[in-house]
UniProtKB/Swiss-Prot annotation:
Residues 1-23, 48-60, 127-152, 1005-1015, 1054-1082, 1101-1111 have a biased composition (Polar residues). Mg(2+) 3 binds at residues 1610, 1652, 1685. The lineage of its organism: Eukaryota, Fungi, Dikarya, Ascomycota, Saccharomycotina. Residues 153-165, 402-418, 960-969 have a biased composition (Low complexity). Residues 583-640 are annotated as: Integrase-type zinc finger-like. It comes from the Eukaryota. This is Transposon Ty1-ER1 Gag-Pol polyprotein. It catalyses: DNA(n) + a 2'-deoxyribonucleoside 5'-triphosphate = DNA(n+1) + diphosphate; Endonucleolytic cleavage to 5'-phosphomonoester.
Amino acid sequence: MESQQLSQHSPISHGSACASVTSKEVHTNQDPLDVSASKTEECEKASTKANSQQTTTPASSAVPENPHHASPQPASVPPPQNGPYPQQCMMTQNQANPSGWSFYGHPSMIPYTPYQMSPMYFPPGPQSQFPQYPSSVGTPLSTPSPESGNTFTDSSSADSDMTSTKKYVRPPPMLTSPNDFPNWVKTYIKFLQNSNLGGIIPTVNGKPVRQITDDELTFLYNTFQIFAPSQFLPTWVKDILSVDYTDIMKILSKSIEKMQSDTQEANDIVTLANLQYNGSTPADAFETKVTNIIDRLNNNGIHINNKVACQLIMRGLSGEYKFLRYTRHRHLNMTVAELFLDIHAIYEEQQGSRNSKPNYRRNLSDEKNDSRSYTNTTKPKVIARNPQKTNNSKSKTARAHNVSTSNNSPSTDNDSISKSTTEPIQLNNKHDLHLGQELTESTVNHTNHSDDELPGHLLLDSGASRTLIRSAHHIHSASSNPDINVVDAQKRNIPINAIGDLQFHFQDNTKTSIKVLHTPNIAYDLLSLNELAAVDITACFTKNVLERSDGTVLAPIVKYGDFYWVSKKYLLPSNISVPTINNVHTSESTRKYPYPFIHRMLAHANAQTIRYSLKNNTITYFNESDVDWSSAIDYQCPDCLIGKSTKHRHIKGSRLKYQNSYEPFQYLHTDIFGPVHNLPKSAPSYFISFTDETTKFRWVYPLHDRREDSILDVFTTILAFIKNQFQASVLVIQMDRGSEYTNRTLHKFLEKNGITPCYTTTADSRAHGVAERLNRTLLDDCRTQLQCSGLPNHLWFSAIEFSTIVRNSLASPKSKKSARQHAGLAGLDISTLLPFGQPVIVNDHNPNSKIHPRGIPGYALHPSRNSYGYIIYLPSLKKTVDTTNYVILQGKESRLDQFNYDALTFDEDLNRLTASYQSFIASNEIQQSDDLNIESDHDFQSDIELHPEQPRNVLSKAVSPTDSTPPSTHTEDSKRVSKTNIRAPREVDPNISESNILPSKKRSSTPQISNIESTGSGGMHKLNVPLLAPMSQSNTHESSHASKSKDFRHSDSYSENETNHTNVPISSTGGTNNKTVPQISDQETEKRIIHRSPSIDASPPENNSSHNIVPIKTPTTVSEQNTEESIIADLPLPDLPPESPTEFPDPFKELPPINSHQTNSSLGGIGDSNAYTTINSKKRSLEDNETEIKVSRDTWNTKNMRSLEPPRSKKRIHLIAAVKAVKSIKPIRTTLRYDEAITYNKDIKEKEKYIEAYHKEVNQLLKMKTWDTDEYYDRKEIDPKRVINSMFIFNKKRDGTHKARFVARGDIQHPDTYDSGMQSNTVHHYALMTSLSLALDNNYYITQLDISSAYLYADIKEELYIRPPPHLGMNDKLIRLKKSLYGLKQSGANWYETIKSYLIKQCGMEEVRGWSCVFKNSQVTICLFVDDMILFSKDLNANKKIITTLKKQYDTKIINLGESDNEIQYDILGLEIKYQRGKYMKLGMENSLTEKIPKLNVPLNPKGRKLSAPGQPGLYIDQDELEIDEDEYKEKVHEMQKLIGLASYVGYKFRFDLLYYINTLAQHILFPSRQVLDMTYELIQFMWDTRDKQLIWHKNKPTEPDNKLVAISDASYGNQPYYKSQIGNIYLLNGKVIGGKSTKASLTCTSTTEAEIHAISESVPLLNNLSYLIQELNKKPIIKGLLTDSRSTISIIKSTNEEKFRNRFFGTKAMRLRDEVSGNNLYVYYIETKKNIADVMTKPLPIKTFKLLTNKWIH
C-alpha cells in the first residue's frame, strides 16, 4: 500500500517542461494535433543546455521477462547491450545503433518502470534498459540527465558524431487516469512528430503516409508501454491490446478518429450556444437544424438535457419570439418539442397560415412516443461530490453513498448560457463530458461496481455529515442502539448499530478523535470532512494531504479511481467487537429510572432543570444517580416538540436592575391569559398568573371572564394569602395597560392597600417579560400535557395548575434553588406525584347497587390544594373528584395510540417510585371507611357535561379495593386490575352545556333534573351520525322508538302516579308531531311531570286547539283573526286532503319498550338496564301511501338501536363538525390561461376569438391609462413587495362572447401594499330577491346595465408596479400602476367608493342604510354587483335618465332595457329570469346547469330513471375510520368541493328545497367516504333531473294594502352530529319565497322546544333587516309574521312568567323573542306540521311529503 502511495505522487517529480505540457489546454477551435511551437522550442533549448554537460560510459544489463506480456523468446537471442537508464522521464539517442538493438525490440524484452503499479508487474532492476531510436531514422533523440557522467553511448560511436547529430525531444507526460487518455494521446502524437515519425501516424482516413518499419514499430510499442501504464488505459484500448498487444497503430488511428469527432462535437456545441432565430427562415428548418445537432451530441455520448437545450434555444430567440424567454423560462419540465410548438405557433401567425396546420406540428401526446428523447431518463440519483476548492479540477460523480447530506449541483441559468461560447459547457450528468474528454466504459460503469474501493482506506466525503464505518474494531467507547436517524442520498434509512469515537494517531505523533457510527449497510467506509473540520483538520487536494490550519501535514491523501482516500493505518484499534456492541445492556439489579419517564413525570421539564433540582434536593425521594442520563442529550420528546413549538427564544436581561433590591413577595408581576375558545361554559376561559420577583414563586387562578369584580376577587385572595402565609406585604405590582388593570375599581383597591401599580409603557412588551414568559411557559406545558395525555381541552387549566406545582419545585439554573426553597417551603415529594393524565381506578364508595362494580376509570390531573388527595377526572361521570382512594392502572400510558417513548414501559418505575405513598394510602383505607363524612372524598369539582364519547374499552370488571380491604392486600389487588385498554376521552363538543371544574358551592352526589322531558330526550347517543332522519310508518306496528332511561336512584323525584307509565317508549331524535299519533292532553302531562321548576318546555295553560292558532299580540287597529288570515292567505302552503276519523290504540299498551344495555347510559351517566321512560312523544310517518325506498322494520330497528350505543372514537380527523357557510368551498375554475386559450388551443376559430379579445383588452388598458407609459423602471430599483405579478385570463360568457382580462395576482400581494380596512361590497342576494319581488308586485321596469372595465375607473393610491404584458417583451422592466387593476386587494373597495360617490353626487341616489350596494331615490332603485347594475322603476324614462348620466363618465352598455310588455328574459348574476310585467316572474338556472353539470364527471342517470327526491330518509352516514391513501383522499376531497360548491351556488340562489341536503353533505367534505360520494352523486343527479325547475312568483293582489313579510321556522331535534339540531327558515314576501336557510344549531338543545326557540331566534334579525329594506324601497305598511309548528314555543313567547329558565342560553333567547314580539308588531302563529314548508330545511322527507311541500312554489 505504501508503494502505491509513493508511486501515485511520483508524476509530480517530472521536469518543468513536462508539467507545462500537461497543464496545456487545447482550444476548442484549434486543431487537436497543433501544439504551440514556442513552447516546444523553449523546452528544447532547456533540454539542449542540460544535455551538453553529459558524458557516456558503456554499460549493460539484463532485462527481466514481463509475465503479463509473455511470449516465446529464442534461446539464441543475446541480451541487448545498452547503457544504464538513470532517469525514466528523458531519452537520449546514440550516434549509431548497436548491432543487437533489433533484439531489444522483441516483445518479451520490454522494460518496466515504477509507474506500472499493477500487482502483475514486479519492480525493475537497476539495469533496466530503455528503448532506443531505430537506426533507420536519421534524426536522433537526446535526453539531458541531471547527473553528470551518467549518459549512455554505443562503443562504436564517436564524440564528434554525437555532438553534430544531437537534438532534444520532449517526452510525453505520464498517463495517470483513463479519463486523461484523450489529452495524453495528443501529446504522444506530437512526440512522434517531433521524433520525425510523423509519416507513420494515421491520417483522417486511418492510413499512414508511409509504411512503418519493424524498428519503428518496436520503438512505438516501447514508448507507449512506458508512458501509458496498463492500469490507466481506457477500456476500449485494453480491448484492442487484448487482441494484439502490439497494435499501437490501431489505437492511434481510433484516437485520431475520436479527436476529429471531438472537433465536430465542439463545433456543434459552439453552434448550439450561438443559435439565432427571428423568424426569417421557416420554423421547421430551424427545428431540423437544432434537433440534428442535439442528436449528434447524444449519439456521441454528450447528452444535452432538455433544460440546457431549451435555455440555449431561448437565448437565441429575438423579435416576436423573444417573449418566449419570459413565458417559458419558469417551466421546469419543459421539453424541446414543447418549445418548438410555441415557435411554430408564432411563425404561423406571422405567415398568416392559420387555416390549416403544417405537417411538422406534433401533438404533445405524440411527443411521448417520439423516438428522440432529450431527457436522460435512466440517470441515477447520485451525489455530486466536489471535495476540492474552487481552483482545483472538476468534481467527480460518485455513486449514491449512504450519507445523510448531499450537495446538489446548481442548475443552469441564463447567466451560464451567456458565457463565452469557446468555453466547454458543464453538464450535470456523468455522461455530459467536456470537449476532448473520452466517453469510455470506465467512465460510464466505473462507479456501478463495488470493486472501485481502495482496501484499507477511508473514503473522504465532503457531502457526508457523519462518519460511518463497517467494522467495529476501530470504535472506542461504543454504545449500542443510538437514537440517531441516518439517511442516504436517496432518503433511505440506514440502520445504525452503535456510536462511538474514531481515534487517529497521525504521523506527527498527534492524536485526535471524532464521532463515528457503525453500520454494515454501506458500500465504503466514509470519513466526513465536516467532522474533520470540527477538530481543525482540513484536506488539501493541491498537495494531497490532510493538514491542520497551521500547515502541519498529518497524513497523505491517495487518489484512487474517482475518489480520494486516507489510509486506515492512522486509526487506533479498540478491543470492542461487534457482539459486544450489539449486546450492551444494563443489569436488572442496577436498573435506573429512564430519563423519558422522569421527563414525563416532571411535567416535561428540560434535562438541565431536572438535574439542578435533583442536585439541590428540591426533588426528594431519589438522587441524580438514580436516573439514566445517557439519552438525555439526544432525547427528543415528541409531545414537547408539538406542544412547545415556538418561533425563537425570548430576549434576556430585559428587566430593570433595581427590581432585584426588593424582599421576597414585595414585588409581583401579573398578567392575564385568554380567552380560550370553544370550551364548555363552566370551564375557565382565562387565567391570571402572579410571579414574585425575588423568589420566582408562581400562582395561577382561573377566570371565566375579565370583569372588574372577578379581577378584584383574585387580587384580594392573593394579597391575603401572602400576608398570612409569608408574613409579607406586597409593595409593587407590575402589570400591563389592559383595561382589567387600569379600571378605577382596581386602582382604588391598590391605593387603599398602599400598593403601587407599575404599568408598562405603550408597546413595551419587554418590560413585562417575567409575566409574559411565565404565561408562555405554562401554555407550552399545557399543550404538551394535553397532547401527551389525550385528555379533552376543557381540562386545560388542570394542566396549567399541574405545571405550576412542578415548576415551583424545580431549581433555577441561575439561583441553584427552587421557588419553594426561596420561599422557605419544603421540596416536592415526587412519590406523591403522578404523570398528568395517568390512568387510575377510583373507588366508588357509594355505588347504586351492592353488585355494581366499585371501580371507576379515571385520569389523574394534579395534587389537591385543599387536601392530601389527588384531583382525578372521571369521564364516565363527567366529574373531577378530590380523593385518595385510587389505584394506578398498570401497563397504560396516558396516550395509548400515540408515542411509546422508545418502546419503554414505566410501570415498574412508577411502582417503585410510588410504593411508599401507596402504602400510606392503603393504611388509611380502614380509617376513612368509618368516617361519617366519607362523601366528602367525592367533593365533585365540576359537573362537566362532556361530549359523551366513552373510552374505547370499558373496564367493566375492574374493582378497586373496598372499604374492608386490608392494607397488605391493597397493592396485590392493584396488580390484578384488568389490562383492558382505557382511552382518554377525545375532544368535547365546544358548545356542550354546563360544566364546572371549580369546587361547587353545594355538594351533591346526584345531579338534579328540573325537566324530565327535555333531560330524557336530550342525551341519546348514536354510533353513527345520521345524515337523514329515521324512518317511521303510519301505523303503530311499524313504528320504532328509542327508549329513554332513568336511574333508580332518581325515582324519588317523581310522584307515585308516574309508576304506571314505566317502560313507555318515546320517539328517537325526530321529536315532531304527527296526526297519526293521538295528542296527550295538557292535564295528563301535568299529572306526569311534577316537582318541576319553570322551564321552556312547559305547555300552555290554556288550550287554543280549536283554531290551531296562538296569537301573541292583538293589535289595536287590525283584528287578530283578520291578521292571521291575511298573513296565511297568500302563502304557498300545501292543500291537505280531508282525513277521516281513525281509531288509534292506546300507545302506552301497544308500543314495545326498548331498553338500554349500557351500564352508563348516554344520558350523562344516569340510568342502567332498569330504565323507564316518563313521557311519550310523537313521530311523523314516513309517507302516507307509497315511497320509492322500502326499508324493513328490522333494518330500521337495527340502525336506531345503534343510537343507544356510545360513539366510536375516530383515528383520522377528516370529519369537520359543521360548515356554516360555503365560503371555504373552492369554486370550479372556468377561466383559461394564455397558453390554454391561444398557444395550445387547437380550435382555430375559438383561438381567433380569444386573440381578438386579447387585443381588445390591451387597447382598453391603454385607453384607460392603466399604467404610466412615460417611464419604465428597472426591477432592481423597486422594492420587491411593491411588484405585483400579472397574467391574462380568458373565459367564454354565457351569451357566447369571448372575453380576455388582464389581472393582478392579488392572492400573493404583500399586506403592506393595501389597506385591509377597506371593504369591497356587493349587493346581498336577499336584497336582489326583495327588489325583484317588489318589482313584480308594483309593475316596475327592470333594466340591466354593464360598465366595461369598471375597476379601471378607480384610481389607486398606493405605489405599485407590475410587469408589462407579454407582447411588449420587456421582462426586465416594470411599469407603475395608476388604476385599480382587476385582482388587486384594494380594487374592489376603490371601485365601490368611486361608483358610490358618483351615484350619490351626480345621479341623486342614496344608499340604503344597512344594505350595501342598494341605492334609491324617489323613482329608481339600483342594485349594484361590481360592474353589473339592475335598475327598477315604474317609469322607464327615469331609468333612461340614470343611464344618460352614467354614460357621461363610464362606458355603460345596456344589456336589457326591459321596455317590452311581453315576457323578457334576463341573466342577472347567474339567475335566468323570465319576467312579464304585471303577471309573473320565473327564476331558474336550466341553461347554466345543462352546461356545468356534465363537466363534473358525475355518472348521470345510471339506472335510466329520474329521481323524485334528493335523498333517502332513514339513512345514516357510517363514520368509521376512512382507510384510503393520501393521494386518493386529496382527490376525493377536491371532487367533493367541486360538487358541493356547485350545489351550494344553486341552492342559495333559488333551490331552497335542497339546502338541507347541501348543508349536511357540506359537513362531510373532509370525510369523502364511498357512501358520502354516492349520496352527493344522488344530489347532483336530482339537480340534473330537475334542472328545468323554476322558482315561481305571481303578482300580488292589487287590493292588498300592506306588504306581508313572513318567516316560517322549523327545527329537527338532535339529528346532527354531537346531538346538534338542524334548524331551517324560509322567508316570504307577499307570498313569494325570497330566501331560505338551513344550518346546524350552534348550541346543543336538550328538547324540541329549545330547538324551535333557537330556530325562531335565528330568523328574527334577518326578518327585521328585510322589513327595514322593504319599507325603504316601498312605502306601504308592512306586517311581519312568524309561523311555527311548536305550540310550546308559542306558549313560552306568550307567557309573562318571569321565573328563571332552566338554561340561561335559551332563556335569553326566549326573553329576546318576547321583546321582539312586544316591540316590533311581530305576530307569531301556529301552523300545522303537514303544512310547514320549512320542514324541507331540517330533515329528509318521503317523496310524497317532499312534493307536497314544494310543488306550490318551485316546479
